Amino acid sequence: MVTYPVQPWTNFIIVYIYVYVYEWKNLSESRPDCQLAGRTNNRQYMYMYIYIDVQMHYCECELCEDTCLYSSFNSLMENGMSISFSAVFVVVYALPVSLILTGSIDILGLCSSGSREAKSRLSMLSALISPFCRGGFKLGNVVVMSTSDERPFRPKRTSRSAIPRPLTCAASSFALLWHDPPFDFRLLFLLV
């Protein structure tokens, strides 16, 4: 039986506080290098922008003005959407990260088998998990890969792994987040 030194809700609280404070601070600042840096280098700001805007208004960097993200952030706050954002953030962002880091996402059946039902759930949730796993991640005997920012994640069949199933999600996600995180999640593990 695998035990984790940190409870799922502890990770949840840490992730929530970290992104809520640190990334909102960055998001509220003007991005004068938006046009020059391009979409890839501004990935973290783009994802946060997508999640806080409940109407899904995208700000493409090719057309982005210096104050695009800043103005949108202020307009959302003026319209009283901070509560709505908190609810969306918990469901879409902080909770999935916590489940992945602790391996608790296995309770959804994603890693428990190679059945069609599990793969169906995987493809439905791949878009949700994709911001945290840019290069791809492994769930059970299925590898989900991302080839570019524009293409969706696609499942690929692989041979069954000899690694115990409870470790598959947690270990793969942890390694990927540590190697190439969309945010600097390494600070979280230092705090823990």
Swiss-Prot record:
GO cellular component terms given for this protein: membrane
Protein name: Putative uncharacterized protein YGL165C
Transmembrane segments: 81-101
Domain of life: Eukaryota
Location relative to the cell: Membrane
Other known facts: Partially overlaps CUP2.
Main localization (coarse): membrane
Bilayer topology annotation: Single-pass membrane protein
Record's keyword terms, sorted: Membrane, Transmembrane, Transmembrane helix
